[in-house]
């Protein structure tokens, strides 16, 4: 316990990346299996409880925020997003990098199920991001670089009729969050000769590159049609 608490102290007060997190990063596939298995167990438990109760009808007010279908879809979206976030097409030296549209699965969930569920799943995505390693400088930096940056993805849920605007909003707000953290706490790493504001804007443009990739994908006609069809089918359980 003392060793564990020491590692937690290192993470949250010294800003270091202890060996514990290196081990987690190296065993991401095992972690993914555990996450999916845990989500599957929860799903099975919910199904069994519903069958045991044998409730023929649940009133609108009594409906849980997550039913079996939405919970299963959330687990799938988180699993896919988690795997994609490990694949760095470009890995930047001071943190961050270009991934193959790792935010898109979470954006899709928020788009289909709305902001309440969207923000909850986005927050879960933030928690999963911590498994990849945390650079903690102070509470404000941690908030903008991690908590807000990933939880804000759920804002796509406010654009139930416009996936494009939801995608753009989620990426731009995450981009802005990283830029604020970079300018406030990391501009000292700027050794490029350009001004600090431009440096922070350019460095964090990896989020904008992913945004463009997401836009291209969701505007492909077959993909767009499949998403809308999936939305109609999944939303049946919410009505």
Please identify what each model-predicted range represents.
Residues 1-239:
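Loop-helix junctions at membrane interfaces
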């Amino acid at each position: 316990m003392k060793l564990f608490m020491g590692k937690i102290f290192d993470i949250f007060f010294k800003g270091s990346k202890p060996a514990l997190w290196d081990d987690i990063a190296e065993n991401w596939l095992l972690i993914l299996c555990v996450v999916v298995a845990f989500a599957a167990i929860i799903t099975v438990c919910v199904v069994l409880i519903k069958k045991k109760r044998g409730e023929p009808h649940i009133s609108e007010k009594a409906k849980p925020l997550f039913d079996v279908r939405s919970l299963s879809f959330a687990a799938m979206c988180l699993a896919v997003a988690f795997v994609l976030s490990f694949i760095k097409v470009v890995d930047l030296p001071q943190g961050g990098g270009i991934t193959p549209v790792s935010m898109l699965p979470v954006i899709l969930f928020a788009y289909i199920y709305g902001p309440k569920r969207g923000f909850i799943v986005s927050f879960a995505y933030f928690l999963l991001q911590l498994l990849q390693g945390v650079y903690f400088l102070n509470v404000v930096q941690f908030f903008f670089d991690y908590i807000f940056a990933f939880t804000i993805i759920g804002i796509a849920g406010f654009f139930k009729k416009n996936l494009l605007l939801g995608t753009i909003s989620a990426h731009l707000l995450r981009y802005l969050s990283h830029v604020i953290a970079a300018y406030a706490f990391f501009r000292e790493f700027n050794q490029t000769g350009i001004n600090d504001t431009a440096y922070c804007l350019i460095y964090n443009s990896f989020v904008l590159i992913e945004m463009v990739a997401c836009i291209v994908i969701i505007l492909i006609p077959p993909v767009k049609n499949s998403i809308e069809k999936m939305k109609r089918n999944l939303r049946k359980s919410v009505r």
